Amino acid sequence: ISRSGVLKQSDKLDHIGVFGKTVEDVALLTKSLIKKDLYDSSTIHYSSDEMLKVCKKGPLYEPKFIFYKTKNWKNVDKESQKSFEFFIKTFKKNIEVFDTPSYFDDIPKYHKIIHETDMANNFQGYYKKSKKKLSKEMVGAIERGLKYSAKDYVEAMDFMKRSYESFKEVFEDYHGVLSPSTTGVAPKGLKSTGSPEFCTTWTYMGLPSISLPLLTGANNLPLGVQLIGDKLDDLRFLGVANWLEKNCKKYAK
């Protein structure tokens, strides 16, 4: 999906997301938005005509998933942990729980280098002219971004390629990867959208992900399960997401 016209923060990390009531709604909307755009070099010619049809059809056979609790599992609130454990138990025929690969430990560091360096480059005009109008968090990120060396940035970019090359073989044996979307239900108010710590790895590797509100957490609010797929495999990815959504509804009845 083209990012043309959107305020650029990081060319390597920025991506467009969509919202929908169901996975099929997401497929319909995405089908209309995926286009090659000469103004965004990250876009490609991608055949999306069959996206909704493939999404409705779902996987050819019952899917298999890896579930990563990750080292951030301790940050998930207790009630949400119980919901995820119930989800894993319910789909025990389909889900295998694994520890994350050791190289995942370095991804947040490298993601931060790219994110903050690009932010410093793209937002320098706002920083110079209107620093006092920016949030403390943004000012801090820009100032850190100005301090990284070219070596730091190149190393972070190189690790991005190597980490994906190491990880992509997972999708040869599994239909997708599952993890929490965040540490719990949506926080009250508009000051924060919650912690991004469960999304950083997938954003860094450029993998598509979708948050499915399949569970219930604190105060009976919806709790997101995150499904991650392989690059450029959006048709199958949305079909698998649709299967997961519909089968969760069956268990809920």
Tell me the role of every PLM-derived stretch:
Residues 1-71, 85, 148-158, 165, ...:
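Structural helix-boundary/capping segments
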Residues 7-9, 55-57, 113-114, 172, ...:
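Short Gly/Pro-enriched turn/cap motifs at secondary-structure boundaries
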Residues 41-48, 63-64, 68-71, 98-112, ...:
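Flexible, acidic loop-helix segments that line cofactor/substrate-binding pockets
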Residues 59-60, 73, 120-204:
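Serine-dependent amide/ester hydrolase catalytic core
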Residues 74-84, 109, 156:
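Active-site pocket-shaping loop/turn-to-helix segments
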Residues 78-80, 108-117, 188-193:
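Short glycine/threonine-rich loop-to-helix capping motif typified by GTGT followed
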Residues 81-95:
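Short helix-loop-beta junction
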Residues 94-101, 210:
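General small-molecule cofactor/ligand-binding pocket signal
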